Amino acid sequence: MRLVIARCRVDYVGRLTSHLPTARRLLLVKADGSVSIHADDRAYKPLNWMSPPCWLVETTGDSDDILWVVTNKAGEELRITLEEVEHDSSYELGLDPGLIKDGVEAHLQELLAEHVETLGPGYTLVRREYMTAIGPVDLLVRDADGASVAVEIKRRGEIDGVEQLTRYLELLNRDPLLAPVTGVFAAQQIKPQAKTLANDRGIRCLVLDYEALRGTESTEFRLF
């Protein structure tokens, strides 16, 4: 991983355009090729980013500024102009073992992948633990019409889980091979506040019956 602290300005050119004026920021270049720009006023979400596969080309013009051009397979560009570099270091972090889920959550994921029709008629599994630049989506599936659906699975559904799925959806919908991607928030219990937030963001909620998925007596699950 490469960490750069620099005064920089950033332009995104793609289906939409955006501009970040000059400020002091942290730039992360990860081993998977992803590039993200961070400020000091948010816990985790970058100001802008480019997901892999993407390619970084670094050039120096007539001025002392350094230009990074990050291009993805769709031809979208993240243009980062570094006016002053204060820190530039690289570290080899090695292979990460990944997040070890709570036993029930891990089993719920496994069971829902095996019984993906629980999500609705005609649903098919694409992959468990579908990797993104910010972590793995529990399940990536397709609905009966072939549209992509990201599924986040929790034992107890709270606002943090909805926020997590929202971040995944923002990222996945930037991939033209997957977009449009909708979301399903699945849990054994979903708090009312989380359900309200999910509905407001167009995310479907699914209350799971763990015993039913395990094939025991109960056959109840509810859609909201």
Curated annotation (Swiss-Prot):
The keyword Hydrolase applies. Its EC number is 3.1.-.-. InterPro entries: Endonuclease_NucS, NucS_C, NucS_N, NucS_N_sf, tRNA_endonuc-like_dom_sf. It is found in: Cytoplasm. It comes from the Bacteria. Signal peptide: none annotated. One of its GO terms (molecular function) is single-stranded DNA endodeoxyribonuclease activity. It holds the Pfam family NucS_C. Cleaves both 3' and 5' ssDNA extremities of branched DNA structures. Belongs to the NucS endonuclease family. PANTHER family: ENDONUCLEASE NUCS (PTHR38814:SF1). This is Endonuclease NucS.
